[in-house]
Amino acid sequence: GLNLMLDPSFFIQQTERLSGTIVLVVSDEENVFFQEKYPVDILAFDQWGGIQVLPELLSAFVVPNHPVLTGVLSRASSILKEWSGNSSLDAYQSCNPNRVKLQLAALYEAIKEQHIAYCTPPSSFGDAGQRVRLSDNVLSGKLGTCLDLSLLYASCAEAMGLHPLLVIIQGHAFVGCWLIDGTFPDAVNDDPSLLTKRTADGINEVILLEATCMTDGNNVTFDTA
């Protein structure tokens, strides 16, 4: 097979979308037997390409192992102890959806305490997808879009051992999480009934959350969000 040598340092330096062409040539010293050009778009390191092409790549911006999350998780643990007397971020070990929901509520409050302001998406010259503020930038800059906040919450939830969900609709994003130790078999689903069935009264296998309710000055409770 053909071994393409890609330079990681080149890609990580890209701050804007870059369009180019890959030229494939099959030849010997005298003759060209085949030549074809293929357009290629290189996205910036913080750019998601949108739902049209490999939408599952959005999950690459969920960063549960980032050290910047430690402070948020520690605060969530403290809140959990205040509420229940048990500070353990024990994920699904209790086999109790209400315990999982309590952990998610504590995380919600911990992020609210960060006083993050809502803002519009970062400017991008590309018309596909969106520029994403990574979790460390959201926490340090105190700014975030609905997508940025959803990714931050999902990153923290996964760091807690939970299974978050990202939900994308026209012009908006929000976040969810499994209340039981489950996942969907596929990385991407476009059937909304898969969520409505699992969030229905009496089922409560999945919870959905409006992430912008965590922004500064917003007094919306976790249950309302």
Residue ranges and their predicted role:
Residues 69-140:
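Secondary-structure boundary elements
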Residues 5-6, 10-17, 91-102, 114, ...:
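Mixed-charge, low-complexity segments
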